Structures are given as structure tokens and as C-alpha cells.
Amino acid sequence: MEQSTLKEYSGSATEHMELIFSKQRANFEADPYPSLEARRTKLHQLKKQIIRYQDALAAAINADFSSRSLDESKLLDLLGSVLEADHAIHHLRRWMRPSKRRTELLFLSNRLSVQYQPKGVVGVIVPWNFPVYLALGPLIAALAAGNRVMIKLPEITPNTNAMLRRMLAEVFNEDEVAVFGEEITDPARFTTLPFNHIVFTGSPAIGKVVMRAAAENLTPVTLELGGKSPAIVSRNYPLADAAKRITHGKATNSGQICVAPDYALVPKESIDEFVEAAKSSFIKMFGHDIENNENYTSIVNDRHLKRIQDILTDAQEKGALIIPCDTYSFDQQGRRMPVHIVLNCTPDMRIMKEELFGPILPVVAYDSLDDAITYVKSDERPLALYCFTHSSIERDRILRETHSGGVTINDWGWHVVNHDAPFGGIGNSGMGSYHGEEGFRELSHAKTVFIRHRFFPTQLFHPPYGTFLQKLAIRFFLKKGDPSIK
């Protein structure tokens, strides 16, 4: 397929973006309800492209990060995208089927259903940490729902942006799917377009900006944000296993994951044992030479590395104890650092105020499960919560008494990668959800359709009021009120 580029267009990048939006809206108006076959064809084409481009995409991500394992990119960015496309292809017929609903007894002779109608043009704003999966996941949901899609990719992943643009341009016209990257120097302008829905993944601060811009057009938004996702380790759970899994969560993509465990809550008498187990787990996974270890991901750029270093400096100056999982702290040139465990954290430190988004693991001591739950509830509602326990009583209590976007028990992150369940936040960690059927519903308009039976007595609701049938209906359904209430 041919897609125009800014070089081929005489106007500005913003004008080009607005032109594409107009084209997509016109395309949607010409075909507002793509058939099941048409939607499946698009999803099959997308899946084939992901498989074809897997090596090139993984290499592009590696180039943008300076170092990220090709296998890690394939497992986390690409495999998830293929599985999500497969899931949509397999279940789309059922999702598209109108949902029959029961009428009230009074309307029994009529038919009632909910039809799921494409919304129109969907805007997708993608973060840099998983630039492929977090572009293709919403794209799959939007195509399954029958929409047209404009994707705004992050400025700091130019190699991935170019490869995604090329991959999608081969199978989609720009009035179906269009990609924008670093040429849009004012990303806020993207959010002011009158989309029919916006999907944004990023920080709560930017999410609020997106939501304010969308409000000008009354555009509904799905916000996948972040927060400080806790990991609660119970006294009944093997400490070494919990430390291994939490450390893996902090080391994967160097902790640059919105659902990475942000901090660990550990029984106070087990802190030292947990620290040693975490250090041992890190060395087993990556050895002592992460400078030359292709399995360990770099911090994406110098600015983000400095932010992480500044957070550690702030904590140290305020009395925290910092323990690197390896014998050195930073590979400055390669922007790599081992997981750093931080003890004696206090609420005034940046490390306990900000989402860390890097290989830093504060470990907070607790006395009782009551204390741990209270600690979690004292902060904003996180995108994820992790609970390590063999007690169903403890597990159920934590699930009942805490709020989070999703939960994995006895590990981290796995609730996100199953496509038959929704992924989304709550409160400060986001609103709305996608993946699987929930993604289809999120990007569809649920339209209620009532078909009147020709013998339905609509005159029951017409004036003049006070007829025998009206009084009978009122008496039957409302019973008798309390005449003493004045």
C-alpha cells in the first residue's frame, strides 16, 4: 500500500496529520460497518506482517535502546501482539453478534438487543518502553471493532517508528491505518483532533493533559497509566522464590514497565534474607558483567538514566541504604545499571513518591498484614498489585481490601498477557480497559435497539391519563405508596 510521507506533502506536519484524519473519517463514513470477513482479513494481514518483520522490529528496538535483547523484544513485544491478533480472529464472530436482552414484563411482546457499532476514527498514543506491543495491541482492538486508526509513536524510538510505519504501510492505506512519529513536534496537537476515541498509555501527569484535550471534543478516552505497584510478601511464602520473581520484574526491560513491581513489602524480620536472595537471583540471571550482557536492557536515554540516578541520590542524602545487586552501580556509557535495592525509605523521599520506572527496588518492612494493607491503601490506586502467599485467607483479604488495575498472585505481570481478560487501571492508574473482548467493547458503541411488536399497547403510555389499564399497571407494578409522606 502507498502511504504519503511529510516529504511528499507540501504543508506542515500538523496539516498533514489533519489531512489524514479527514481521509480516515471519509473512509469510515463510506464503510461504517466493515463485515466480519473484512475485519478478519485486516487482522490476518497484520499478524503476517508482525511475523515477517519480527527480526527487523527487534533490531530496531535494540537500536533505539542501545541494548535490548532481541529475544526479549520478540517475547514481550511481538509474541504478545501475535497472540492478541489470534485471539481476536478466533472470537470476533461472537463479539460482533448482537446481544439479545430481556425486556421488562410490561414490554414482553417486544424485542430488545445491543448492537456493537464501530466508533469511527481512533487515536492511539504510544509510550517508548514497549513501542511495538503498545501500538499493536490497541490497533488490534480497534480493527476488530471496525474502526480506522491513527497512531502517534514516541519521539525517542525513531528506528522502531520507521520500521512500524513501513510494516503497516505495506498492508494498510493511510485512510485505514496511519502512523506518526517524531515529525509531530507538538504531540498535544494530536490529542486535539476530534477522534471518536483515544487510547493513551503513559504517565498519570500526561494522561491528565490528554483527558483535558479530549474533553474539548467530548472524546471518550482509555487511559493506561502507571503508579507504584506493590509486591506483598507473606510470612508463609518461600522468601527466595518471592525475591527471585520480584527481582525478575525489576530487571526485565530494566524495570521500564508500567506493571513492574515498584516496591516490596517484606516481613521486618526477613529483610536481610530477602536482600541476599534478590542479589543472588540477579547474579544467576545476568552474571557479574552486565556491561557486555546482551540479555540486559539499557535505560532508554541519558535523561532517564539521570532521573534514576537523581532518585537514588535523593534517597541516599535522606538516609536510605542503597545496595546494588552487583559489585558496581552503573555502566554509564551503556546506560546499564543492576537492580538497586533500597532500605530505610521514608515518605519524603522521591523514591516513595514517584513511579520509579527503572531498576530500583525499595524494600519496606512491615509488622502485620494489617500494616501492609494499610500501607498500600495510603497511596494512589496502582496499575498492578502482586501478592506472594499460600494462604487463601490472606489472598482473598488482599483482593477484597485493596484496589488495583489487576493482580498476579505468586508472581508478577502475568495477568496482563492473557488476552481473554481486560487490562486497565483504576483511579490514578487509568480508566477503561482493552485486550480481548473488553478491547472490542471499549472501542465499539453499545447501541440499544428496541423493536416494537405491532400489538404492543403503546396507548397505555399516552394521555389522557387515568384510564383503567393505566391504573391497573400502576397498581400492579408500584403497589401502594405511603400517603403520610407529604
Locations of the language-model features?
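Rossmann-like NAD(P) dinucleotide-binding subdomain of oxidoreductase/dehydrogenase enzymes
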Residues: 105-241, 366
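Residues at or immediately preceding the N-termini of alpha-helices
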Residues: 17, 36, 54, 239, ...
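Short, well-ordered beta-strand elements within core beta-sheets of diverse protein domains
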Residues: 26-32, 124, 232-233, 263-266, ...
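ALDH superfamily catalytic-core signature
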Residues: 4, 9-11, 172, 205-346, ...
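Conserved C-terminal structural/oligomerization subdomain of aldehyde/semialdehyde dehydrogenase
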Residues: 329-332, 336-486
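Residue-level signal for inorganic ion chemistry
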Residues: 39, 85, 146, 177, ...
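N-terminal Rossmann-like NAD(P)+-binding subdomain of aldehyde/semialdehyde dehydrogenases
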Residues: 1-113
